[in-house]
Amino acid sequence: MNVLAIGAHFDDIELGCGGALSKHVADGDNVYAYVATRSGFKNCQNIVVRSNETAAKEGEKAMDILGVELIKGRFNTLEVEFTDNLNLEILKIVEEKNIGLVYLHWMGDIHHDHQAVARASLHSCRHVPRQLMYRSNWYQSNLEFRGNFYIDITDFWEKKKKSIEAHESEMERTGRKWIDFFYNEAKNAGQRIGVDKAEVYEVVKWLV
């Protein structure tokens, strides 16, 4: 099976579905990750917090850990819009790689870039038979994430963790919050289905 994960920034995919992707690789699937933005950003004082070069280097390392082929977009962080440029870039990958399963941002995510990429993903992947939405942060939304599809990542948590830790610049900025949060999420999801750790998704479509 050919699998595509779509994220707005370097780190979104690792946080949201890194365990599942690592499992797909172990199962022999062809796994690709498309990251829409160059992912560098500045703070409100216009000081660079993370450069595009640093983000790309860390993203490449993270995908190497997961064993995933990385496809890099060229959009600027916080400037992503639901436009034909983005739609066509995703559609080209879907058609060239003959994608059968796509992981995409949750539509209820309040992050501007995440919303735009989620909409573009749904539009461009409308003919992909299996689609799962993931959460890559803990931001509150007025919408409910309806997690109804679980993947056992017990044997793949360490790879997911290492792929997150590959984003050293972000780890320096946030400390261990990411690791702690997603570890707890994985443990809680695992308890619901009787395994040690799991990732949970909202199904858009699942053709059998």
What are the functions of these language-model segments?
Residues 36, 64-76:
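A conserved beta-strand->alpha-helix junction
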Residues 34-36, 73, 104, 134:
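Short glycine/serine/threonine-enriched helix-capping/active-site loop
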Residues 31, 70, 131:
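Hydrophobic anchor at the start of a short beta-strand
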Residues 41-68:
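Glycine-rich phosphate-binding loop and adjoining beta1-alpha1-beta2 segment
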Residues 1-4, 23, 27, 46, ...:
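Metal-dependent de-N-acetylase/amidase catalytic core
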Residues 2-10, 14-49:
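ATP-dependent adenylation/pyrophosphate-handling site
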